[in-house]
Regions:
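TM-loop-TM module centered on a large, flexible mid-protein loop between adjacent transmembrane helices
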Residues: 11-14, 58-122, 141-190
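Transmembrane helix-loop boundary segments of multi-pass membrane transporters
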Residues: 91-94, 108, 171-201, 217-220, ...
Length: 285
């Protein structure tokens, strides 16, 4: 198609940022969505036999993997195809190998992309299942969600409920026939929820640093400049939410997101009311 592979695409504004700085900022939403579940690294390694050894090793290896599999892959895509040559309807890796004259490799990469999507879905099911189980154990969710299977000791009912909720998501295709529009809306909603979760983690860390400095002093794996970087991250999250108002699809998701928090607040108040009624019944008995 006349595009010559060259590293000069990295410095050419029309190839590197064809939509200018506003397009670059608009990409923050999908970038946040792409790293959804990264917080599970601490959750899963904490459940291993030797978390004090495995957790630092896993976290220290993460930046290098992001550079290799995310940043360098983007460099290769831009160098070969440039952004204007990559269609939003096709995987950029498929486009890359197709332009290089390797259609078989493009098919393989397409298969890898599908398996990656399945892996991402599996991580989502794992996290939601574990969260439901934990909430049930703490008596913040229905007691049936903490029932374990006899053989595998897996919270089966939490797992089935998570899968059911994921299946409901496919019905959205009937409400929004355009796949890319639907993907933008859903990914934006997910990014907003992720920003909220990450923000709460950072706030909890700041409170922990202020209220329990003794525990932090005894930690063997401290975050360098943890307090400063927490505030920087919170400011970045606020900016990422702010720029969502400039795109119609992301704005729609942003306006709809309060409904989820209102629903959670309603369920919480209902739970408190039931607990209060049970307390009164027990006292009267």
């Amino acid at each position: 198609d006349g595009v010559t592979a060259s590293l000069s695409h990295l410095t050419d504004p029309t190839a590197f940022m064809p939509h200018g700085i506003t397009g670059f900022f608009a990409g923050f939403q999908i970038a946040i969505f792409s790293f959804t579940g990264i917080e599970l690294l601490g959750t899963m390694t904490a459940e291993t036999r030797d978390p004090q050894r495995i957790l630092p090793k896993a976290i220290n290896a993460l930046p290098l993997r992001i550079i290799i599999f995310y940043l360098l892959s983007m460099v290769v895509i831009i160098a070969v195809a440039s952004w204007p040559g990559v269609s939003a309807e096709t995987s950029p890796f498929v486009t890359l190998f197709a332009k290089a004259g390797l259609p078989a490799a493009a098919a393989v990469i397409n298969f890898v992309a599908l398996t990656s999507a399945m892996s991402s879905a599996n991580s989502g099911v794992f996290s939601s299942t574990r969260m439901l189980y934990g909430l049930s154990v703490e008596k913040h969710a229905h007691w049936q969600f903490r029932i374990l299977s006899r053989n595998t000791r897996i919270p089966v009912r939490s797992l089935l409920f998570s899968c059911f909720c994921m299946l409901i998501g496919t019905l959205l295709l009937f409400l929004v026939p355009n796949v890319m529009t639907l993907f933008t809306i859903v990914s934006t909603l997910a990014a907003i929820m992720v920003v909220f979760s990450w923000g709460m983690i950072l706030v909890a860390y700041l409170v922990y640093r202020r209220q329990r400095p003794d525990l932090h002093a005894g930690s063997i794996f401290k975050m360098p400049a943890g307090v400063v970087m927490s505030w920087v991250s919170l400011l970045f999250f606020a900016f990422a939410i702010f720029i969502m108002i400039f795109d119609p699809d992301t704005l729609l998701a942003l306006l709809a997101s309060p409904l989820w928090f209102i629903a959670l607040w309603g369920f919480w108040k209902l739970k408190q009311r039931r607990e209060g009624q049970l307390t009164l019944d027990n006292q009267s008995a």
